Regions:
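Catalytic lumenal/periplasmic loop and adjoining terminal transmembrane helix
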Residues: 6-124
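Core SAM-dependent methyltransferase catalytic element
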Residues: 120-141
Length: 142
């Protein structure tokens, strides 16, 4: 019984080790993909000036952790684009903006640049840069 129990124990350890290696490979692959996507987003946004707000509309964890980490000098606004108080801001949203919403902003004097689906860490979102084409006083009238 002693030798068969030892062999069974060694076999169990080998199976668990094999499963652990497989889990590590899957996790590492996911981590690498997230890192590539995060770097792409960070390179696109760069270092925004302090008056540029970061507006997030319900993207999980983005508004209260991730954006504060990457953009500590910028104001983070949790809400939709109507709650931005700056005349230029990055808008992170879980769903693409409707054509009507974009047209409404353009009609109100804003330029809307659509960067499509992006990602920070494990959090995907649609990214827009919105800025007033008119003077700031016009932009505040939304």
């Amino acid at each position: 019984l002693g030798l068969s129990a030892q062999l069974l124990f060694v076999l169990l350890l080998l199976v668990m080790f094999g499963m652990g290696i497989q889990n590590y490979r899957e996790s590492y692959g996911s981590y690498e993909q997230q890192k590539v996507e995060t770097d792409k987003t960070l390179d696109l946004i760069g270092t925004p000036e302090e008056d540029v707000q970061m507006v997030t509309n319900g993207v999980k964890h983005l508004g209260w952790t991730v954006l504060y980490y990457y953009y500590p000098d910028n104001e983070i606004v949790n809400g939709d684009y109507n709650q931005a108080e700056s005349d230029r801001f990055w808008y992170f949203t879980p769903d693409a903006m409707s054509d009507e919403a974009v047209a409404g902003l353009q009609q109100d004097g804003y330029r809307v640049t659509d960067y499509g689906q992006m990602q920070l860490a494990q959090y995907p979102f649609y990214l827009y840069y919105i800025e007033a084409v008119q003077p700031a006083s016009f932009a505040k009238s939304r």
